[in-house]
Protein backbone atom coordinates (compact mmCIF):
# COMPACT_ATOMS: atom_id res chain seq x y z
CA UNK A 1 0.00 0.00 0.00
CA UNK A 2 2.83 2.37 0.89
CA UNK A 3 4.51 1.64 -2.45
CA UNK A 4 1.29 2.29 -4.39
CA UNK A 5 0.81 5.57 -2.52
CA UNK A 6 4.40 6.59 -3.30
CA UNK A 7 3.86 5.85 -7.00
CA UNK A 8 0.63 7.87 -7.00
CA UNK A 9 2.32 10.84 -5.33
CA UNK A 10 5.18 10.63 -7.82
CA UNK A 11 2.75 10.68 -10.76
CA UNK A 12 0.91 13.67 -9.30
CA UNK A 13 4.21 15.53 -8.88
CA UNK A 14 5.23 14.64 -12.44
CA UNK A 15 1.99 15.86 -13.99
CA UNK A 16 2.03 19.02 -11.88
CA UNK A 17 5.60 19.86 -12.92
CA UNK A 18 4.87 19.23 -16.58
CA UNK A 19 1.83 21.48 -16.59
CA UNK A 20 -0.52 18.57 -17.41
CA UNK A 21 -2.09 18.45 -13.94
CA UNK A 22 -5.02 20.77 -13.32
CA UNK A 23 -5.92 21.66 -16.88
CA UNK A 24 -8.93 23.68 -15.65
CA UNK A 25 -6.48 26.45 -14.65
CA UNK A 26 -8.27 27.05 -11.35
CA UNK A 27 -6.13 29.10 -9.01
CA UNK A 28 -3.47 29.96 -11.59
CA UNK A 29 -2.15 33.50 -11.12
CA UNK A 30 0.11 35.79 -13.10
CA UNK A 31 2.66 35.76 -10.27
CA UNK A 32 2.85 31.96 -10.38
CA UNK A 33 3.40 31.92 -14.13
CA UNK A 34 6.04 34.66 -13.96
CA UNK A 35 7.85 32.69 -11.24
CA UNK A 36 7.69 29.55 -13.40
CA UNK A 37 9.04 31.51 -16.36
CA UNK A 38 11.97 32.90 -14.36
CA UNK A 39 12.77 29.42 -13.04
CA UNK A 40 12.52 27.91 -16.52
CA UNK A 41 14.92 30.47 -17.96
CA UNK A 42 17.55 29.52 -15.41
CA UNK A 43 16.55 31.31 -12.22
CA UNK A 44 16.83 34.86 -10.95
CA UNK A 45 20.50 34.53 -10.02
CA UNK A 46 21.54 33.36 -13.50
CA UNK A 47 19.45 36.07 -15.16
CA UNK A 48 21.01 38.76 -12.98
CA UNK A 49 24.46 37.36 -13.73
CA UNK A 50 24.04 37.79 -17.49
CA UNK A 51 25.36 41.33 -17.79
CA UNK A 52 26.12 41.39 -21.51
CA UNK A 53 25.23 39.17 -24.44
CA UNK A 54 26.55 39.10 -28.00
CA UNK A 55 24.54 37.14 -30.57
CA UNK A 56 25.72 36.46 -34.11
CA UNK A 57 24.11 34.60 -36.97
CA UNK A 58 22.01 35.42 -40.00
CA UNK A 59 18.94 37.50 -40.78
CA UNK A 60 16.64 36.10 -43.45
CA UNK A 61 14.22 38.47 -45.18
CA UNK A 62 11.98 38.42 -48.26
CA UNK A 63 10.91 34.84 -47.53
CA UNK A 64 14.53 33.79 -47.09
CA UNK A 65 15.65 35.09 -50.47
CA UNK A 66 18.00 37.62 -48.84
CA UNK A 67 20.48 36.65 -46.15
CA UNK A 68 22.27 39.26 -44.05
CA UNK A 69 25.01 38.76 -41.49
CA UNK A 70 23.47 39.49 -38.09
CA UNK A 71 25.13 40.80 -34.94
CA UNK A 72 23.36 41.99 -31.81
CA UNK A 73 24.91 43.17 -28.55
CA UNK A 74 22.97 43.79 -25.35
CA UNK A 75 24.06 45.19 -22.02
CA UNK A 76 22.10 45.46 -18.82
CA UNK A 77 20.09 47.33 -17.75
CA UNK A 78 18.84 48.50 -21.16
CA UNK A 79 21.33 49.00 -24.00
CA UNK A 80 21.20 47.28 -27.37
CA UNK A 81 22.80 47.50 -30.80
CA UNK A 82 21.93 45.47 -33.88
CA UNK A 83 24.03 45.34 -37.08
CA UNK A 84 22.83 43.64 -40.27
CA UNK A 85 25.29 43.51 -43.18
CA UNK A 86 24.81 42.74 -46.87
CA UNK A 87 27.27 43.38 -49.71
CA UNK A 88 29.47 45.60 -47.56
CA UNK A 89 26.64 47.81 -46.32
CA UNK A 90 25.55 47.67 -42.68
CA UNK A 91 22.21 48.68 -41.22
CA UNK A 92 22.56 49.80 -37.60
CA UNK A 93 19.96 50.34 -34.90
CA UNK A 94 21.05 51.21 -31.37
CA UNK A 95 19.71 52.42 -28.03
CA UNK A 96 21.90 53.58 -25.14
CA UNK A 97 19.26 53.64 -22.43
CA UNK A 98 18.26 57.23 -23.18
CA UNK A 99 18.14 57.76 -26.92
CA UNK A 100 18.18 55.71 -30.08
CA UNK A 101 19.73 56.11 -33.51
CA UNK A 102 20.11 54.31 -36.82
CA UNK A 103 22.11 54.10 -40.03
CA UNK A 104 20.14 53.11 -43.14
CA UNK A 105 22.51 52.72 -46.11
CA UNK A 106 19.98 50.79 -48.21
CA UNK A 107 17.81 53.91 -48.14
CA UNK A 108 20.73 56.06 -49.22
CA UNK A 109 21.40 57.33 -45.69
CA UNK A 110 24.93 56.53 -44.62
CA UNK A 111 25.08 59.02 -41.75
CA UNK A 112 23.66 58.21 -38.30
CA UNK A 113 20.21 59.64 -37.56
CA UNK A 114 18.54 60.03 -34.18
CA UNK A 115 15.25 58.24 -33.60
CA UNK A 116 12.07 59.72 -32.19
CA UNK A 117 10.71 58.50 -28.85
CA UNK A 118 8.09 56.42 -30.69
CA UNK A 119 10.69 54.87 -32.98
CA UNK A 120 12.71 53.86 -29.90
CA UNK A 121 9.91 51.77 -28.43
CA UNK A 122 10.78 48.56 -30.25
CA UNK A 123 14.46 49.02 -29.36
CA UNK A 124 13.62 49.49 -25.69
CA UNK A 125 11.72 46.21 -25.75
CA UNK A 126 14.56 44.52 -27.62
CA UNK A 127 17.06 45.75 -25.04
CA UNK A 128 15.34 43.79 -22.28
CA UNK A 129 17.76 40.94 -21.70
CA UNK A 130 15.15 38.70 -20.06
CA UNK A 131 11.89 39.93 -21.61
CA UNK A 132 8.98 41.92 -20.18
CA UNK A 133 8.03 39.49 -17.38
CA UNK A 134 11.23 39.59 -15.35
CA UNK A 135 11.35 42.64 -13.06
CA UNK A 136 7.97 43.84 -14.36
CA UNK A 137 7.11 45.54 -11.06
CA UNK A 138 10.33 47.55 -11.06
CA UNK A 139 9.58 48.60 -14.64
CA UNK A 140 6.18 49.97 -13.59
CA UNK A 141 4.24 47.42 -15.66
CA UNK A 142 1.19 45.38 -14.73
CA UNK A 143 0.84 41.68 -15.57
CA UNK A 144 -2.44 39.77 -15.84
CA UNK A 145 -3.13 36.13 -16.67
CA UNK A 146 -5.89 36.08 -19.28
CA UNK A 147 -6.24 32.33 -19.94
CA UNK A 148 -5.15 29.86 -22.58
CA UNK A 149 -4.77 30.41 -26.31
CA UNK A 150 -3.75 28.15 -29.16
CA UNK A 151 -0.33 28.90 -30.63
CA UNK A 152 0.17 26.69 -33.67
CA UNK A 153 -1.26 23.67 -31.86
CA UNK A 154 0.10 24.46 -28.39
CA UNK A 155 -2.38 25.40 -25.66
CA UNK A 156 -0.25 28.23 -24.28
CA UNK A 157 -0.63 30.32 -21.15
CA UNK A 158 -1.34 33.92 -22.16
CA UNK A 159 -0.18 36.87 -20.06
CA UNK A 160 -0.98 40.52 -20.69
CA UNK A 161 1.72 43.06 -19.85
CA UNK A 162 0.72 46.72 -19.77
CA UNK A 163 3.79 48.91 -19.75
CA UNK A 164 4.19 52.18 -17.92
CA UNK A 165 3.75 54.08 -21.20
CA UNK A 166 0.49 52.27 -21.98
CA UNK A 167 1.86 49.92 -24.64
CA UNK A 168 0.84 46.27 -24.35
CA UNK A 169 2.67 42.96 -24.73
CA UNK A 170 0.98 39.59 -24.81
CA UNK A 171 3.34 36.81 -23.74
CA UNK A 172 2.56 33.17 -24.54
CA UNK A 173 4.24 30.51 -22.39
CA UNK A 174 4.67 26.86 -23.32
CA UNK A 175 2.47 24.86 -20.87
CA UNK A 176 5.16 22.25 -20.24
CA UNK A 177 8.37 24.29 -20.11
CA UNK A 178 7.07 27.81 -19.28
CA UNK A 179 9.35 29.48 -21.81
CA UNK A 180 8.07 32.12 -24.24
CA UNK A 181 6.97 30.70 -27.57
CA UNK A 182 5.29 33.86 -28.86
CA UNK A 183 4.96 37.54 -27.99
CA UNK A 184 2.62 40.11 -29.50
CA UNK A 185 3.51 43.79 -29.06
CA UNK A 186 0.91 46.53 -29.44
CA UNK A 187 2.48 49.98 -29.61
CA UNK A 188 1.34 53.43 -30.62
CA UNK A 189 3.85 54.99 -33.01
CA UNK A 190 3.29 58.33 -34.74
CA UNK A 191 -0.39 58.10 -33.83
CA UNK A 192 -0.83 54.67 -35.44
CA UNK A 193 -1.40 51.32 -33.73
CA UNK A 194 1.45 48.92 -34.53
CA UNK A 195 1.06 45.20 -33.79
CA UNK A 196 4.10 42.94 -34.09
CA UNK A 197 4.14 39.17 -33.61
CA UNK A 198 7.32 37.33 -32.65
CA UNK A 199 7.77 33.55 -32.44
CA UNK A 200 10.63 32.14 -30.40
CA UNK A 201 12.19 28.68 -30.34
CA UNK A 202 15.32 26.50 -30.45
CA UNK A 203 16.30 27.48 -26.91
CA UNK A 204 19.87 26.84 -25.79
CA UNK A 205 21.42 27.32 -22.37
CA UNK A 206 24.05 30.05 -22.28
CA UNK A 207 25.75 30.92 -18.98
CA UNK A 208 22.90 29.21 -17.15
CA UNK A 209 20.17 31.08 -19.06
CA UNK A 210 17.96 29.69 -21.84
CA UNK A 211 18.17 31.90 -24.94
CA UNK A 212 16.05 31.48 -28.12
CA UNK A 213 18.23 30.74 -31.15
CA UNK A 214 15.34 31.08 -33.63
CA UNK A 215 13.28 34.28 -33.76
CA UNK A 216 10.69 35.08 -36.41
CA UNK A 217 8.91 38.43 -36.35
CA UNK A 218 6.79 40.79 -38.41
CA UNK A 219 3.43 42.50 -38.59
CA UNK A 220 0.75 40.29 -37.08
CA UNK A 221 -1.23 38.19 -39.57
CA UNK A 222 1.26 39.11 -42.30
CA UNK A 223 3.10 36.35 -44.20
CA UNK A 224 6.06 38.68 -44.71
CA UNK A 225 8.23 38.05 -41.66
CA UNK A 226 11.93 38.14 -41.01
CA UNK A 227 13.77 35.28 -39.35
CA UNK A 228 16.85 35.47 -37.17
CA UNK A 229 18.95 32.33 -36.79
CA UNK A 230 21.54 32.57 -34.04
CA UNK A 231 24.73 30.61 -34.66
CA UNK A 232 26.85 31.85 -31.76
CA UNK A 233 26.10 33.36 -28.34
CA UNK A 234 28.79 34.97 -26.19
CA UNK A 235 27.80 35.81 -22.59
CA UNK A 236 29.39 38.48 -20.42
CA UNK A 237 31.78 39.76 -23.06
CA UNK A 238 33.60 43.06 -22.62
CA UNK A 239 31.49 45.79 -24.19
CA UNK A 240 32.38 49.44 -24.75
CA UNK A 241 29.38 51.66 -23.94
CA UNK A 242 30.39 53.93 -26.81
CA UNK A 243 29.04 51.41 -29.32
CA UNK A 244 25.49 52.16 -28.14
CA UNK A 245 25.81 55.94 -28.18
CA UNK A 246 25.09 58.26 -31.09
CA UNK A 247 28.41 58.68 -32.95
CA UNK A 248 30.17 61.99 -32.51
CA UNK A 249 30.51 64.02 -35.73
CA UNK A 250 33.76 63.39 -37.56
CA UNK A 251 36.31 66.14 -37.02
CA UNK A 252 36.64 68.47 -39.97
CA UNK A 253 40.05 68.59 -41.58
Q: What role is predicted for each listed range?
A:
Residues 23-30:
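Cleaved targeting-peptide boundary
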Residues 101-131:
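Acidic/charged, solvent-exposed loop-and-adjacent secondary-structure segments enriched in E/D, K/R, S/T
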Amino acid sequence: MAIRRLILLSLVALFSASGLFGQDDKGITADQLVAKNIEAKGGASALQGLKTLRLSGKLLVNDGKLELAYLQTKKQPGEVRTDATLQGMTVVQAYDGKEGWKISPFQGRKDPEKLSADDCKSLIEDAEMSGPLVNWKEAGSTVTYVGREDVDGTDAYKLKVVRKNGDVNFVYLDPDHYLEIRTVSQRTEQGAQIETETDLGDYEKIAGVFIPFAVESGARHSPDKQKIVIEKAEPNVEVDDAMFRFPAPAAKK
